[in-house]
Amino acid sequence: MKILIKLWTNLINRISNKKYLAAVSGGPDSMAMLNMYKRNIRVVCHVNYHKRESSDRDQQIVVDFCRKNNLIIEILDVDEKVYERYGHIDNFQTKARLIRYDFFKEIGKKYNIENLYIAHNFDDFLETAYMQRARQSKALFYGIKESNVINGIIVKRPVLFVRKQTLQRYCDENKIKYGIDETNELDIYERNRVRKIISSWSLNEVYDFKKFVIKYNKEHSSFANFIDLSYIEFKKNKYKYDYFIRQDDMVQYYLIYYFLIDHKIINPSENKIISLIKFFGKQINKEKAYRVQENIYMHVNDDELISLISYNKSDNISNSNVDIIDDHNVIEK
């Protein structure tokens, strides 16, 4: 395995002329990726949320590696001022994701780099697919894609099909320091619970689940491509209500989903999307808007474009030009 990884990374390093940002936490996955692909990495990005006792230790591990290998490092020290900017988001995982991807975008602009390496591994892939299946998600792709665009950044995952234990062994064999996130063992997050389930699987169970996921993704690939093209057209038309309302319910579902993701409304629930389809399916009423997140509402504006507006209940109603009506999800403008 060690020889195969070395041959693969050497090949990638030779054929790739692009320079990348790299998101590095200090854990074994990202430290292994950093060492494997350091020839292609121009800037290392590290985010310190200060939510764990070991946060500063992990930061120092990344700093020391970058100094030793003459790599530029950019660090986001997430303090209360940063958290306040994302105060409208209750879920910490969602908030943390938005914080780091905004940071990656900022650093990408600073260095004129549009490509980003992230160290998602095969265990992450399995965990994501498992949770999607357990929720009976309408996702058209189970797992994590090798490449996609997030917040305007081209994200590449070069170690996606390498097991976590293999990456940790790579670090040990190459004497690369790393930190272990102590919260990974706590059952406070759904992913941690799923991680324990998958870690108990036999190789045959892993293989069977992988086979199921590959089959699912193949069966949905044509429709997924159609949805991608439909959303590109929807976006090109500045989210015209007329374009949206002419689609069938299933297409509308994904147009709303992608719209919300595009506008940083992370993990919208299926019930929320279905409610929005019903809301927009009624006779167009520009005087109403539907809540998609705390203080954020979706509506059809005066130009008949679907858009978001911000409204805080503590605002002076006369200043905001908004009146509350009975449905707690809906406001009347």
UniProtKB/Swiss-Prot annotation:
GO biological process, alphabetically ordered: tRNA modification
Annotated EC: 6.3.4.19
Positions bound to ATP: S25, G26, G27, P28, D29, S30
Pfam families to which the protein is assigned, alphabetical: ATP_bind_3 (PF01171)
Main location group: cytoplasm
Subcellular location(s) of the protein: Cytoplasm
CDD domains, per database record: TilS_N
Record function comment: Ligates lysine onto the cytidine present at position 34 of the AUA codon-specific tRNA(Ile) that contains the anticodon CAU, in an ATP-dependent manner. Cytidine is converted to lysidine, thus changing the amino acid specificity of the tRNA from methionine to isoleucine.
Domain-related comment: The N-terminal region contains the highly conserved SGGXDS motif, predicted to be a P-loop motif involved in ATP binding.
HAMAP family associated with the record: tRNA_Ile_lys_synt
Name under which the protein is recorded: tRNA(Ile)-lysidine synthase
Source organism of this protein record: Ureaplasma parvum serovar 3 (strain ATCC 700970)
